[in-house]
Amino acid sequence: MKKISLLIITLIVFSGVSFSQNTFTLSSTDLGGQATKTEEFSGFGCEGENKSPQLSWANAPEGTKSFAITMYDPDAPTGSGWWHWVVFDIPANMNELVTNAGNINLNLVPKGVIQSITDYGIKGFGGPCPPEGHGLHKYEITVHALKTDTLGLDENTNAAVVGFYLWNNTLAKASIVSYYKRDNK
């Protein structure tokens, strides 16, 4: 009985290793654990460059038909957080967004990829800009593997509605977290 238990535990452990090698992942060559002035928003009292970070993802689950990217600050003093970036209808054959792809004027994403309204009221990337002295804010950047080619939404759709559609169509998601704060001047 002891040998059977050991065998089962061994199989579970090694099964976990093989699964972890195929885990859906998100990474960035631009972000460490701390956002910088490069990503910081330009406006709302912030004076950053407002460049979206490079993002790449790997090992999407079988059945993935498209991707979406979101950037969200759960620490924003709004009662509902703050959506900084909402990108969807990314083709399933893509696995990267280059640095500054969130600048809709540069056309760094393929036609058909939609960058909709953020909580700043703009389309495209709106970088971190926490209130001065509010402490460290957490920024969750997430790639969603979707079971549909398109969400059927447009660039004027607000983040909450996009989030609802993502919730209904996500097969898997992977996230990275970055932090940012602004001290009192």
Which residues are covered by each model-predicted region?
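N-terminus-centered regions that define maturation/targeting leaders and the start
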Residues: 21-185
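Sec-dependent N-terminal signal peptides
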Residues: 4-14
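Sec/Tat signal peptide C-region and signal peptidase I cleavage site
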Residues: 16-20
